[in-house]
Amino acid sequence: LMRSSAASDVYKRQMEKWKAAAQAAKDVIDLGIYSLYGSYATLFKNNFQNSEFILMRRYGNSSDFEKYNFPVSYGGVGGVNPSLNLVDSYEMKDGSYFSWENEENAVRPQFYRDDRLNATILLNDSVWKSTAVENWDGGKDGLGVTNATKTGFYLKKYLNEDVNIQTGGGSQGHIWPLFRLAEIYLNYAEALNEYDPENADIAEYVNRVRSRAGQPNLPSGLTQDEMRERIPVSYT
């Protein structure tokens, strides 16, 4: 009986924390001074007046971010290599899951996907600076080339495509968002899902983020566990 009571107390404290987290997120939303930026594709393109960014850090022109992350044939050293798990987490355009067991998916993994995939990651044949990236084994950006990607993928998010390293160009200033409204929406939904899983605001705020990215609304009737799985995917 004592163990049962202790477990109940722990559960109540956990629920109180989720409730407090939801309220904190809702308080930020209700300020009414932030709004989702219209285009995910240009969300991270150094707009210092971005309506979505709540807290950000600025870096000057000497960051060399492009030099350290461009694909190797473009003068970079491919520093950040996104993982296959990250690539696979992006849904299909219709909201279904991507699967390597689907023959069409496997042949063209970058086609008919959530637009945020191609806005975030340079896959094989992605067009960068008007030419196709060659991430395949034997390609100019593929395995075996010095400093080439180790995963088959390069970072695209935050990179300034106008920088030309090969002609002596350097980096430009960068903005790193530490908190943005999309995260607050999903924090709110996640916390609500834990202590009030029937609350209609859960789907409402997740779908706002999905809609901005061009993804369909979540199917209705998702269980609490299913929603736990779908909320993180909506943030990618």
What are the roles of these predicted feature ranges?
Residues 5-74, 78, 84, 98-235:
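Acidic/polar-rich alpha-helix caps and helix-coil junctions
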